[in-house]
């Protein structure tokens, strides 16, 4: 999804900001496919997430055939910082501590993780390795807004819902990973 999320959409069970947006021109950083349409090209980060025919794949590669497959099958694809590759921590240049989020694959189970406290990217990735995660990539953390609906139907919001108000304008290419009810 690109653009502001409809907070009243009851079909959404999870959403979080996905790809980074360039500060200089508002473009999406790295390769990005939305419902089969390429919206950005390039390799800025080696981590990727693809959703094609209802199958989510998280991985790390310079070149992935899933970008092309997403364009051919009306799928989705985006790039982000890699955190874990084949159960091995991937070092990244990002420094400092922040709330961290990631999308992970552990033995074929896809799930999202968020830290409860500000952490370094290294410590976050190490925790994922310690949890037995096979593959993981970063999702935009810090104040980026999103929500999840648990099995009882309770909504859990994270980030700052009012971040893009006043003088701060949401970049037009702000993208979200969205999971919906079947």
Put a short name on every predicted segment.
Residues 1-182:
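Gly/Ser/Thr/Pro-rich low-complexity, intrinsically disordered segments
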């Amino acid at each position: 999804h690109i653009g502001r999320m409809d907070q009243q959409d009851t079909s959404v069970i999870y959403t979080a900001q996905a790809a980074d947006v360039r500060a200089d021109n508002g473009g999406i950083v790295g390769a990005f496919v939305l419902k089969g349409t390429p919206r950005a090209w390039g390799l800025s980060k080696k981590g990727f997430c693809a959703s094609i025919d209802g199958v989510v794949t998280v991985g790390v590669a310079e070149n992935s055939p899933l970008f092309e497959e997403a364009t051919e099958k009306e799928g989705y694809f985006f790039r982000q910082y890699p955190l874990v590759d084949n159960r091995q921590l991937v070092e990244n240049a990002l420094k400092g501590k922040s709330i961290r989020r990631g999308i992970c694959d552990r033995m074929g189970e896809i799930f999202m993780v968020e830290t409860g406290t500000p952490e370094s990217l290294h410590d976050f990735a190490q925790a994922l390795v310690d949890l037995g995660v096979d593959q993981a990539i970063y999702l935009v953390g810090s104040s980026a807004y999103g929500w999840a609906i648990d099995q009882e139907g309770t909504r859990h919001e994270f980030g700052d819902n009012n971040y893009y108000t006043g003088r701060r304008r949401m970049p037009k290419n702000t993208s979200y990973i969205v999971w919906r009810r079947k």
